[in-house]
């Protein structure tokens, strides 16, 4: 079984409609709510309700803010690793690293046929909706530059941590909803849901 995880109603409804139209089988769709605890607890509860070897892959689908210049609303990011941007456990842990856990969590994206529609990069997760250039730059300054953070969200690393502990392959696919590095962030976010979301999520759904 493949488990698809979303956070918000808007994301959930778009994915649910597409799965029904495509008559996709052996797939479960979850909506956990926004944030790290909601994401981790929602996925953990589901995994506890099924036989351990039934789930072969977890795919998180949702939105993220861009963390690099040039990314536009509607662009699609495939996470190649996941980290927290709001965690500090002291030395010798890296910034963003939960003690006893990897500094970054791995991604299983080998099943995706990569092309020019998608960009690989690290997705940084924290319990904050990031809206300004200053916030993005502070996050990137806090984390090691080698992470190549290109998007910021509120769920991916928490889901990746659950999958890491369970030994389940995990992939996060994020559609860029806005770029806080640009002054038009507020308008971008509103315009994304009005004009671009359905088209962008259709691209993502065809991967599933």
Segments (PLM) and residue ranges:
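Extreme N-terminal starter segment of soluble prokaryotic enzymes
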Residues: 1-3
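Gly/serine-rich nucleotide phosphate-binding loop at the start of the catalytic core
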Residues: 5-8, 12
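Glycine-rich phosphate- or other oxyanion-binding loops that anchor nucleotides, phosphorylated ligands
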Residues: 13, 17-208
């Amino acid at each position: 079984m493949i488990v698809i995880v979303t956070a918000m109603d808007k994301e959930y409804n778009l994915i649910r409609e597409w799965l029904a139209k495509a008559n996709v089988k052996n797939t479960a769709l979850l909506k956990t709510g926004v944030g790290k605890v909601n994401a981790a607890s929602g996925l953990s509860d589901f995994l506890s309700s099924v036989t351990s070897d039934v789930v072969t892959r977890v795919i998180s689908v949702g939105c993220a803010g861009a963390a690099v210049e040039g990314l536009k609303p509607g662009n699609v990011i495939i996470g190649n690793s996941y980290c927290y941007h709001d965690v500090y456990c002291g030395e010798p842990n890296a910034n963003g690293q939960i003690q006893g856990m990897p500094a970054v969590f791995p991604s299983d994206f080998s099943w995706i046929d990569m092309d020019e529609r998608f960009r690989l990069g690290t997705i940084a997760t924290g319990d904050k909706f990031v809206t300004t250039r200053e916030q993005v730059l502070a996050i990137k300054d806090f984390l090691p530059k080698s992470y190549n953070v290109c998007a910021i969200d509120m769920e991916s690393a928490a889901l990746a941590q659950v999958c890491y502990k369970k030994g389940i392959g995990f992939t996060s696919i994020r559609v860029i909803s806005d770029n806080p590095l640009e002054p038009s962030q507020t308008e971008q976010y509103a315009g994304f849901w009005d004009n671009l979301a359905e088209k962008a999520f259709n691209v993502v759904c065809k991967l599933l």
